Amino acid sequence: MAWTTHKFRKNIMDSETGVIRKKWNGRIKVALVYPSTYHIGMSNLGFQAVYELINTFENVVCERSFLPENGGSDAADRITTIESGSSISSFDLIAFSVSYENDYPNLLTILEKAKLPLGSKDRGIPHPLVIAGGVAFFLNPEPLASFIDCFLIGEAEAILPRFFDAVSHDLLSQDRISCLKTLAREVPGVYVPSLYRTEYNSDGTLNAFEPIADVPHKIERLYVKDLSFTPTCSSIVTPNTIFDNTFLMEVSRGCPHGCRFCAAGFVYRPPRFRPFSILKECMEQGTSKTDKIGLVGAAVSDLPDLNKICGWEFEKDARISFSSLRADALTSELLSILKKSKTKTATIAPDAGSDRMRNVINKGISETDILDAAEKIVAAGIPNLKLYFMVGLPTETLDDVEAIVTLCKKIKHRFLKSSRAKKRMGEITVSLNSFVPKPFTPFQWVQMDDVRLLKSKIKKVKNGLKRVANVRVHADIPKWAYIHALLSRGDRKAGQILSLVNTNQGNWPRTFKSSPVNPDFYVYRERSLDELLPWDFIDHGIRKSFLKSEYKKAIQGKTSPPCVVESCNICGVCTE
């Protein structure tokens, strides 16, 4: 069914509970765009939270838009909003909410389908102002620097009120450069790429990154210091998402454990937890819409009131779910509540097969923790187990890859032993992903494994487990991990590759063959610890010396303790 049909929009809106309907009436009109399909975008709690937040501003109306269901491949596709069916090109602002780097090409597709010039320098009055935010840009916005007018670097609750206080019809009617200069000067966290100059060394590395106007030299990431007053939960519940009529609520932000591969554990510092009082308000709102509640956070297991929350949900006959739980935090109370919630699958993330590799990544759990967790899960009556692993981690050997197979077999043995007592054998699903180095982590300097090597490692795990009954292996596709790495650590020159792949209608092999920019430079090259990195202009409060220290400890196989926010100033975020 074509994206533009009235029937499609009507079916979508009829299935939604909680949609916001707001009259335009001279308000600033914002098209909030998720650069993937409705099904994916509406599964993203951050996108929903931004939609609700923008609509709380009296002078603003916000409507949602997405990539067409066919990926924009139909020449007749138009990019319109769900609420009114209006073209996004008729709005005052187009705001992209982006969580995943591999969605960058979709962003260009959407601009093109909206009949807007792709380059920021080619847009002006009467074109909409094109802005972008989301965790992908906390890390590194540079590959999209040529296409976006301004980026909002920070958490939505901290930056959006200031941004929309500054935005007015008068400001938007000014010439584009004047408008952008005003925003960059008046709103902390606003990054306007056109107001900064880059200079490169002969070897392609970055030599200089400097402002060319009276704007900040560094862009400070804004964040909410106390989550006690800012609930984040689903504004709309619909069956047309990955989570199917589930009310999502964020219970925490950031993570204290400091896994060295995990960007969320660093750019969302300090770790913060919401109190039971505000979460109870969210749960009351959620249970009025559905009986399925999903807890969202990088450190759900560390939430002080987790048992209390789960107990409250159970009293309301709600079913509760988690993204994943730490193997060393599975209490009998928690497992009992999960069973009562009719949870069929529990998820834990060993991430690596050997204790040596888990020390390298600072995972903080042992093989004993993992095996005990598997046994507890089955004993609690939860029949299925999902395990997350990575291949291609720094210092990894083939012995470490083989250790994934060995550990899975040990887990299966424990699983089988406990399942026999229950007279029921469930399934173990192994999810295998290629490691991608990310900015603002201790591994931001390392090279990524060659795609062919990653394929061979994945094959080794699959072959090692293919004859093990009730164990299934799902692996990512390394070529997409390669593109992920390119877009994660690219500089402005990587934007040329994005422009070319858009011209080639998503054909990456043809793009790489004809690109004047070598993508291997961003993917397979190990960086010097002293190199000026494309994302160094963003200030997360994390000392670069801390990341270097963590990288060196990783290579030595040494671990670091978790964050103790009240008394720690090691990384630099909590020095105030």
Where are these regions (language model features)?
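Conserved SAM/AdoMet-binding glycine-rich loop
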Residues: 33, 37, 281-386, 390-429
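Canonical Radical SAM [4Fe-4S] cluster-binding loop centered on the CxxxCxxC motif
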Residues: 44, 241-276, 567-576
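Glycine-rich beta-alpha loop elements in corrinoid/cobalamin-binding modules
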Residues: 67-212, 439-491, 498-509
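Low-complexity, highly charged intrinsically disordered N-terminal segments
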Residues: 30-35, 41-52, 60-63, 68, ...
